Design a protein with these regions (language model features):
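Solvent-exposed interhelical
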Residues: 165-193, 202, 231-251
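Interfacial loop-to-helix transition and helix-capping segments at the boundaries
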Residues: 15-18, 47-59, 126-135, 141, ...
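Alpha-helical transmembrane segments of multi-pass integral membrane proteins
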Residues: 56, 223, 227-228, 248-360
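Structural signal for the C-terminal ends of transmembrane alpha-helices
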Residues: 71-79, 111-114, 176-181, 228-238, ...
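Membrane-proximal cytoplasmic C-terminal regulatory module of class A 7TM GPCRs
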Residues: 305-309, 360-380
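Membrane-interfacial alpha-helical segments at the cytosolic side of multi-pass membrane proteins
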Residues: 30-35, 68-72, 106-110, 167-180, ...
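Transmembrane alpha-helical segments and their boundary/interface "anchor" motifs
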Residues: 56-59, 75-117, 127-133, 139, ...
Length: 380
C-alpha cells in the first residue's frame, strides 16, 4: 500500500453497519425542519434562529457519518484484498452520487430556461444578476458550490455535496499513500488545525460569515472526526471504561446532546466562539452519538434508529436532501412552497428520484461490478 507496506487494520465492523440509515434520517429531518420553518404558511413559532439553524447541525451529522463510513469501507477493502482500488472506489462513488445530482441540476436548469424559476436572484443580497445563473450552474457541475458565497437558493444546498466530493478526492489518496498510522496523524492534524484556520479567517480573513460553515479548509475537521472514529473503533472497544460508556443506554446520548447543545447555543450568542470552538464541541457530540448507535443497536435509541420507516427515510435521505430545496424556498410564496404541502412535495419528489434514478443505477453498479446495491454513501 505504501513503500513501507504499512498495514491498515480493519475496524471491528463487518457487513451492514447498524443505525447509519437511522442517523441519516435524523440528519435530513433536521435539515427539513430548519428549512421549512421559514417558508410561507409555517407556524410563526418555527421561524426563529433556534429552529432555522438546525439544518447546519443536520449537515454536520452527514459529514461525520461520511467520514466514518467511507473510512470503514476503505479499511474493510484493504483487509479483504490487501490493497485499496482507487479506480473502483471512484466508480462506486460515481454510480452512487452523480446520476441523482446531475438529474437535479439538469431539471432545475430546464425549469429556469422555461421561465418557471429564477436563478438570477442572490439570496444573501436579494439582488438580481443576469450573469449569475451560469456561474451557479458551473459551480454545481464542478462541485465547488461551497466557495460560491453569492448563491441562489435552488443550487445552494449543493455546497455540502461539494464538500463531500472534495473529501472523496483527497482522503482515499491519503490512506493509500500514507498508510494507516500516518493517515491517523493526518486526521488528528485536521481536527487540530481547522479551528485555528477558522480563527485566522475570523481575525484576518475578509470572508463572509457563510465561509466558516462551508469552505473545505474550515469544515474538514467534521469529516476528519468521522475518519478518526472509524480508525480507532477497534482500539476503543479494547478500553473497558470507554466501551462501557459508549454502550450505556443513556450516558453517551446525554453527553453528546449536551455538547451539541452547547455548540448550538454558542452559535446563537457568540458567532466567533461558535466558528472557532463551537464546531469542535458539535463534532465531539455527534461522534459520541454515532459511536453509541453503531455499537448498541439494541438500546432504545438504537431500536428507533433501525425501525424500517426510519431506515427508509435514511435510505432516501440523499434524494430528499436534493429535492427539498425547490419546495422549501422561503423567498417564494406559491402553492408548491407553502407549508405543509411543500413537505409532501419534497417527500414525493425524493421518492421518485430514489425509485427511478438512485436504485436503478445502484442495481446497474451491482450487475456490472458485483458490489452491493445497498446505499453506502454518507452524502446527504
Amino acid at each position: 500500500m505504501t513503500r513501507q507496506r504499512q498495514a491498515i487494520l480493519p475496524p471491528d465492523l463487518s457487513g451492514h453497519i447498524p443505525s447509519l440509515d437511522g442517523l441519516r434520517a435524523f440528519s435530513v429531518l433536521l435539515v427539513l425542519i430548519g428549512h421549512v420553518a421559514a417558508t410561507h404558511g409555517a407556524p410563526l413559532w418555527m421561524d426563529k434562529p433556534a429552529i432555522t439553524s438546525l439544518g447546519n447541525i443536520g449537515v454536520r451529522f452527514f459529514f461525520l457519518i461520511s467520514g466514518f463510513l467511507i473510512t470503514t469501507l476503505l479499511l474493510r477493502e484493504h483487509a479483504r484484498k490487501g490493497r485499496i482500488d482507487l479506480g473502483q472506489f471512484y466508480l462506486r462513488r460515481a454510480y452512487r452520487i452523480l446520476p441523482a445530482a446531475f438529474a437535479y441540476i439538469g431539471l432545475i436548469w430546464l425549469a429556469f430556461q422555461l421561465g418557471w424559476i429564477d436563478l438570477s436572484l442572490s439570496v444573501p443580497t436579494r439582488a438580481q444578476d443576469e450573469a449569475a445563473p451560469l456561474r451557479h450552474l458551473l459551480h454545481s457541475l464542478t462541485f465547488t458550490a461551497n466557495y460560491n458565497h453569492d448563491y441562489n437558493w435552488y443550487y445552494n444546498h449543493l455546497w455540502s455535496l461539494s464538500v463531500e466530493e472534495q473529501f472523496y478526492l483527497l482522503w482515499p489518496f491519503v490512506l493509500v499513500l500514507a498508510g494507516f498510522s500516518r493517515s491517523l496523524h493526518v486526521a488528528l492534524a485536521a481536527i487540530l488545525l481547522c479551528p485555528l484556520i477558522r480563527l485566522a479567517m475570523h481575525l484576518w480573513g475578509d470572508v463572509p460569515e457563510i465561509a466558516f460553515n462551508r469552505e473545505f479548509q474550515a469544515i474538514a475537521d467534521a469529516l476528519a472526526m468521522g475518519c478518526l472514529a472509524a480508525m480507532l473503533h477497534t482500539r476503543l472497544s479494547a478500553m473497558p471504561r470507554v466501551k462501557a460508556f459508549l454502550t450505556h443506554p443513556l450516558a453517551p446520548l446525554a453527553v453528546g446532546g449536551l455538547l451539541i447543545g452547547a455548540a448550538y447555543a454558542s452559535a446563537l450568542v457568540s458567532r466567533p466562539f461558535a466558528f472557532v470552538l463551537g464546531q469542535v464541541l458539535s463534532n465531539l457530540g455527534i461522534v459520541i452519538i454515532l459511536q453509541h448507535l453503531v455499537r448498541s443497536p439494541g438500546t432504545w435509541a438504537g431500536r428507533i434508529a433501525n425501525l424500517k420507516p426510519v431506515a427508509l427515510i435514511g435510505a432516501m435521505s440523499y434524494s430528499l436532501y436534493l429535492w427539498q430545496e425547490p419546495f422549501l424556498y422561503f423567498l417564494v410564496d406559491s402553492w408548491e412552497t407553502r407549508f405543509p404541502l411543500n413537505l409532501l412535495l419534497s417527500f414525493g419528489a425524493a421518492w421518485l428520484s430514489y425509485r427511478f434514478i438512485e436504485q436503478p443505477f445502484l442495481r446497474l453498479k451491482e450487475r456490472l461490478h458485483g458490489s452491493p446495491a445497498r446505499s453506502t454513501a454518507g452524502v446527504p
